[in-house]
Structure formats: structure tokens, C-alpha cells
């Protein structure tokens, strides 16, 4: 007969993360740790583990970050990005159901991997958008002289 693992609590998650080498910081309602030099928060409530990754954005390039976040959301269905109310940070969130440490040990690395993939996708999207903006600003409008010459050379068939 298979025995059930004891009920999982935030404190047991913290201990497991310490054993796995995440160097977490225990807070009253969550656990804070780092993913690729970005702040990550883990919350646990009613058998749902939520891992959130936060990183700062440039306020002047808000629109670019917003568009890149939307594209990231479409490319990574398991990760939900959100720009926070202060307009200075983006949060990527990944949730999974889990009621024991054995499952937690299995699902946490997957969630972190998905968050890293989403962060990489977001960086790629930002680079694409910046490059597209540079290309758009590099185009030079045609002069009226070049447009006027087209009419003389083309015949319109009706």
C-alpha cells in the first residue's frame, strides 16, 4: 500500500528549496529567491504553487515591453506575463497544483525552466521590436520628383 506524503506547507517547501540549492529567503507569506539575477517569489495556498519572476523595465520604452510581453504570452501558454501597476516592473507567473513535496520536487524545476524560457523569449521579442523600429526610422521617403516620373513611364490598362 502506497503511503501519502505529509501535507505540504510553506516551511517544508523552504527546506526543500534549501536542499536543492536555491538559497531562498523565507517570508511570512512567501519565499523569495533568485532566477537569473531576477527576483522570484514562490507562494503556496490550497495546493497551488505559484512561482513569479519579476524584472524591471525602462519606462520610456513601456510600449515595446508591453508588445514583447503580449508576444511572449502567445508563445508560452504556461507562463502569464503582466505589467504591474507601477509601470516599472513586469511579472511572469507560472502555477501548478501540488499537495506533497515529492511532486513539488518534480514540478518546481519545470516551472523555473518555463519562466527562463519566457524571459529568453521576451528578450528576443524586444530585440526584434527594437530592430524593426530602427529599420522603420532608417527608411527615407521618396521625393516628389521620383514619384512624378513613374506616371510618365507607366501605362494604365483599363
Over which residues does each language-model region extend?
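Short, internal acidic amphipathic alpha-helical interface segments
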Residues: 52-95
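Short, charged/polar, Gly/Pro-enriched secondary-structure boundary elements
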Residues: 38-42, 98-101
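A short acidic-to-branched-hydrophobic micro-motif
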Residues: 41-57
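Charge-rich, low-complexity N-terminal segments
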Residues: 1-41, 80, 84
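Ampiphathic alpha-helical segments that act as solvent-exposed interaction surfaces
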Residues: 68-76, 96, 100-131
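A generic structural signal for beta-strand entry/edge sites
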Residues: 28-30, 46-50, 87-91
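Short, highly charged C-terminal tails/helix-capping segments
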Residues: 127-158
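Short amphipathic alpha-helical segments
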Residues: 2-9, 60-65, 107, 111-114, ...
Amino acid at each position: 500500500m502506497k503511503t501519502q506524503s505529509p501535507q505540504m506547507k510553506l516551511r517544508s517547501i523552504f527546506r526543500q528549496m534549501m536542499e536543492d540549492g536555491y538559497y531562498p529567503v523565507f517570508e511570512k507569506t512567501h519565499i523569495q529567491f533568485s532566477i537569473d539575477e531576477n527576483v522570484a517569489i514562490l507562494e503556496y495556498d490550497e495546493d497551488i504553487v505559484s512561482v513569479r519572476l519579476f524584472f524591471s523595465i525602462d519606462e520610456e520604452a513601456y510600449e515595446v515591453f508591453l508588445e514583447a510581453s503580449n508576444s511572449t504570452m502567445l508563445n508560452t501558454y504556461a507562463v502569464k506575463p503582466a505589467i504591474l501597476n507601477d509601470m516599472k516592473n513586469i511579472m511572469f507567473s507560472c502555477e501548478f497544483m501540488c499537495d506533497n513535496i515529492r511532486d513539488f520536487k518534480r514540478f518546481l524545476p519545470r516551472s523555473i525552466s518555463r519562466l527562463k524560457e519566457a524571459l529568453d523569449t521576451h528578450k528576443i521579442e524586444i530585440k526584434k521590436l527594437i530592430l524593426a523600429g530602427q529599420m522603420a526610422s532608417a527608411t527615407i521617403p521618396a521625393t516628389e520628383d521620383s514619384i512624378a516620373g513613374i506616371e510618365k513611364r507607366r501605362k494604365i490598362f483599363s
